[in-house]
Amino acid sequence: MQLNESRAWTAFYAPGTPKDIEVPNGSLPDMLSEIAERFPDKPAIEFFGAQTTFAELQDQVLRFAQGLRRIGVKRGDRVALIMPNAPQHVVAFYAVLRLGAVVVEHNP
């Protein structure tokens, strides 16, 4: 799928930034798994001077998804996230998607 529709804001992109990108097929959790496998030691999240690698993020997502599954969250369920923009939010977001559930954002 190409995202190539003319958009005014692209005039403000830094030089060399592509205006068209190829969006791969697959889910976000599948993409995270692939990236974690290819680049396990690369930083995925930097937050207040602390780094989380892609391997660490993937591990946290899988463990949180397992916890959600244990309490009964399943495909199609809606899960509200009321969290600040912090690493824990990223983990929760991907864990919900990993189960096939739907994230319902309620950012404070």
Locate predicted features:
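Structured binding elements
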Residues: 100
